[in-house]
Amino acid sequence: MAKYSNINSFNALQTLTVGSSNYQIFSLTQAEKKLGDIAKLPKSLKVLLENLLRFEDQLSVKTEHIYALAEWLKTRTSDQEIQYRPARVLMQDFTGVPAVVDLAAMRAAMAEAGGDPEKINPLSPVDLVIDHSVMVDHFADDQAFEENVQIEMQRNGERYQFLRWGQSAFNNFSVVPPGTGICHQVNLEYLAQAVWLGEDDGQTFAFPDTLVGTDSHTTMINGLGVLGWGVGGIEAEAAMLGQPISMLIPEVIGFKLTGKLQEGITATDLVLTITQMLRQKGVVGKFVEFYGDGLADLPLADRATIANMAPEYGATCGFFPIDEVTLGYLKLTGRQSDRIALVEAYSKAQGLWRNAGDEPVFTDTLSLDMSTVQASLAGPKRPQDRVLLSEVPKTFNALMELTLKPAKEAKERLENEGGGGTAVEATKANIQHESPSCVIEGQEYPLNHGDVVISAITSCTNTSNPSVMLAAGLLAKKAIEKGLQRKPWVKSSLAPGSKVVTDYLLAAGLTPYLDELGYNLVGYGCTTCIGNSGPLPEPIEEAIQCHDLNVASVLSGNRNFEGRVHPLVKTNWLASPPLVVAYGLVGNIRTDLTTQPIGQGKDGQPVYLKDIWPSQAEIDAVLQKVNTDMFHKEYAAVFDGDESWQAIQIPKSKTYEWADDSTYIRHPPFFEGIGEPPKPIKNIEQARILAVLGDSVTTDHISPAGNIKKDSPAGRYLQEQGVEPKDFNSYGSRRGNHEVMMRGTFANIRIKNEMLGGEEGGNTIHVPSGEKLAIYDAAMRYQQEHTPLVIIAGKEYGTGSSRDWAAKGTNLLGVKAVIAESFERIHRSNLVGMGVLPLQFVDGQTRQSLNLTGHEVISIRGLSDGIQPHEILEVDVKGPNGVASHFNVLCRIDTLNEVEYFKAGGILHYVLRNLIAS
C-alpha cells in the first residue's frame, strides 16, 4: 500500500530537481491551479495544506478538506476539522517513560487478545531524549557534573533499562542517553532537518519537516521553520501508531516585528515582552506567525527563544518561515550541504520562503518595534507577568504588603481588644524586618524575605542562545575582575541544553570565571527549570520553614509557576542568563539593579550593573568562537552514551516482563477489559465534587513533577513498598508507576481547594462525612461508595506542561467531568483522550455566580442521547439544603474524531481496539 497519496486530485505530484538529485513533491504551485490563489496563505497553513495533499485518501483526507484550507483566506477562520500527520515524534523521559509503558501495556493486551503484539510499533520516527532526570544535588564545585550524573544513574537505573528495552523492542524508536542535552536543543541543533525525506514505492519524497512532541516546549523548533507543537503522551502514542492528529484549521495571528533591539537588551527581554503582549491578545488554540522586516536581523537562536515560549503566550505554535537566516544556522550546526540546498530549493518552490516585504493574510495582527523593548524579568508566579528590571523591588514589596497585611477580621479583633492600628503595623514591621540567620560553611549570615536562594542558568529557552550565554560569561569575568563574589546563600548552577555550550564557553575563555562564581556545570538537562533544583542547604531550608520566609529564585527558564522550581521558594523570576548571574551577586530581589550597587569592588568603590554588563561589541567578538566543528564533535555519537549507559543489561523479549515489586515501572490498568465492547455513554448521575479550584490551575498543580513529601499518600505508599524517603526521587521519575501517580494527583503543596477556604495543599472535604482528607484518600472512599466525581474550576484550567498524567491521574481518581471557565489546549485534549469530559461554563457563568461550594450533588444530562462536538449539556444541581437548580455547559469535545475516542474510553483504547479487530 502506498504511504503517500496516489489519488492526486489536484495534480500536485511533481518532480523537484536539486543538483543531481530528484525528489517527488506535492507542489502547492500546481495545486493552486485548481484551488485558486493561495499565495497569501500564512506559511504555517501552507505546511498543513501540503500535508493534506500528500495524505489525500478520500477517507480521512477528502477533497473538501483541502478546499477548506484554500477557503480559509475568505473568512480567515474555519470550523473545518482536518486530519494532520506529522513526520515524526519527539519525547523526553518524564513523558516518554509513561508513553513507552503504555505501548508495552498495549502489546500485552494485544497478546492477551490473541493478536500479534508487534503490530504495536511506531510507524514514524520517534526520538526520546533523556533530559528530565538530572537533579542539582551537587553544585558550585568542579566535581558537580560527575557526581550528579552518578546519582542520576543510581536513581534511574530501572527506568533507563526500560528505555533501553524499548529501543531494542520497537522499530523507529531511538534514545538519546542522559548527560547529552535537552530534547528541544538537541532537536534544534541536530535532529530537525527543515525538509524531511521519505521513501515510497522506490521514490524519494521531500516534504516539510513537522513533528509533535510530548513536551509543551516542542514549539521551539518553529524558530527553524519546522512546524511542531506539544501534545500529551497519549496523543503522541496514537500518532506514532498511525492515528492522525484531529484538529480544526486554526486561526493564525500575524506578529509583525520591526526595528532592532537596543544595546544591552537581550533575546530574553524580547520574548518576555512578546509573551505578555500575546497573553493579553488571547491566542489560545491559534497559530502565531512572525513576519516583518525585523526578521532579517533576528538571529535564529533568538527566533528559537521566542518560539520556545509559545505555551507561555498560549499559542499552539509561534512560527518563523525559512529564510537566509535559517540556512545560515543549518550550515553553522553542521547539517549536510545537499540537505541545505534542498531546504532552499524546496522552500522557494513551495512558497514557504520568507521574502522581504511579505504580508500574508492573517486572522488578526499585532506588531512590535523591537527598539522599544526594555530590560525585564517575569514574575513572581506567571511567565506572562513581565516586570521591568527597575520595577522588580516595587513588585516584590507590593506582594509582601499583601502577604503580610492582616485579615480584616483580625484587624478588627485587635482594635476591639485595645491593640489599635499601631499594634497591627508593628506586627507587620516585625515580620517584614526580622532577619533570621543561617550558618553556611561555618559563617553566620542573615536571611530575609526577598533573598535569592536559587540562581540557575538553565533551560533550552536561553541556553540554546550563544549570545545570552556568552553575555553571562562576560558578566562573570567582569565581576571577578571587580572583586565581586556570589552571595553564600545563593545556590548557583549552570545546566546547558547541549555540550556545544560548554565547548564555546571554554573556547572563549569564560568557563573559569563562571566556575569561580559557583556557576559550575551541574548537568546537561532541564534541572531547575522543571523543578529538579535539588535540595537547598539544610540551614537555609530550616530558616525558610521556621520563619516562613518568602525567598526567591532567579532562573533563565520558561516557567515560574508556584511550587514548580522548589517547594519552599514562593516567588520565582524568569530572567536572561546575565541577569541570573547579577542576581546571584547581589543575593536579593529587593535591590534595584538599575540604580543601586550590586556590591563593593576590591577597590572599595560601589559596583553597578552597568559597570559589568557586556557591550554588544564584546559579545559579538566572542560569538566568533562558536563554530561548526563543535557541533560535529558533540553530535557524532549522540546516541551512544557513556560507559554506564552502555553497561545497562537489556531484556531481549518483544513484550515487557513486568516486575511485581517494581516501584518505577508497573503494568497500568488502562487496557483492562479491552477485548470487550466499550460501554455505552451514560448520563453522569449523583456525582460529588472532588475539588473547587480557581484560575490558572496548572498541570503542575494537578500532577506535580517535583519532590514527593514523606507524609503524602504517594510518600506513604513508597515507604510501604520499602523505599526510604532519600530514594523517593521525584513524581516525574515515577510516571511509569500508576500507583504513585494517582496518589500524587492534585497533591501539589501549593494547590488551593476552595472547599477548604483556599487552604494550600492537596486536601478536600469528603462531603457525606464532612471529614478532611487527602484528595486521593477522598477519591478512593468515593469509589468504594460508587460515587462518580467532578472537578469545578476557573479560567485556564490545565495551563502549563503537556503532562498526560494530569489527565490519567484524574481518570484513575474516578473523575468523570471537569467543569471550568476555559481550558488550555493540550490538557483539554488529554482529558478527552483519557475519557474524561471537559465542560465549559457558558453565558458568563462561573462557580462564584452559581454559588458552587463543593457540597452539591451534580448530575449531567444529555450524554446518553449521543454526544456531539460543542453540544450544550444540562447540569442539575442539588444543594446541601436540598434546593435544586440547573445550568448549561458547553461540551468541549471539539471534533467528531474526539467523539469516537471518548465513546471508546479514550484515544489509545480506540487505536488498540481497531488493531485487535484487524
Regions found by a protein language model. Name each.
Residues 1-918:
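Fe-S-dependent hydro-lyases/dehydratases of central metabolism
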